[in-house]
Amino acid sequence: MEPEEQSTLVVLTTGKEAFVRANAVLQMTLMVRKTAQSPVELLLLGQGVEVLRSNQKNSPQFEQQLAGLREAGVQIAVCEVSLESLGLTKDQMFEAEAVKGGVEVATRLQEGWHVLTF
């Protein structure tokens, strides 16, 4: 019996305060995409939106990892409510689709996606 294709939403709520953890989640997201060959989306929520900041010390490394995720076909989304609550704007960030995080998670759950939160 063939396994069903299972889409995965990875939610990153850890920001620059835990660089090693955020880095590990980005690497794990890439491995899920390459291994599963099914849709994978990375949602940056809460402090996790800081990974997208283009003007911080670790920006070059995050930019490289995000580019690798995009090349592998991972959709990258950022919670616009989190951006606003942290006083950040989209022009301070690397490219990502702006979504309402709670709505995105609820939608993906209704669609049967696995949701992994870090």
Model regions and ranges:
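Basic/polar N-terminal segments that are highly enriched at the extreme N-terminus
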Residues: 1-4
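Short, glycine-rich nucleotide/cofactor-binding loops
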Residues: 6-23, 49-56
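Histidine-anchored nucleotide/phosphate-binding helix
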Residues: 21-35
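Short internal beta-strands
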Residues: 29, 40-46, 76-80
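Anion (oxyanion) recognition and catalysis
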Residues: 33-34, 70, 109-110
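Small/aliphatic-rich secondary-structure junction motif
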Residues: 34-39, 45-51
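A glycine-rich helix N-cap at a beta->alpha junction
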Residues: 58-85
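C-terminal structural segments of small proteins and small subunits
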Residues: 85-111, 116-118
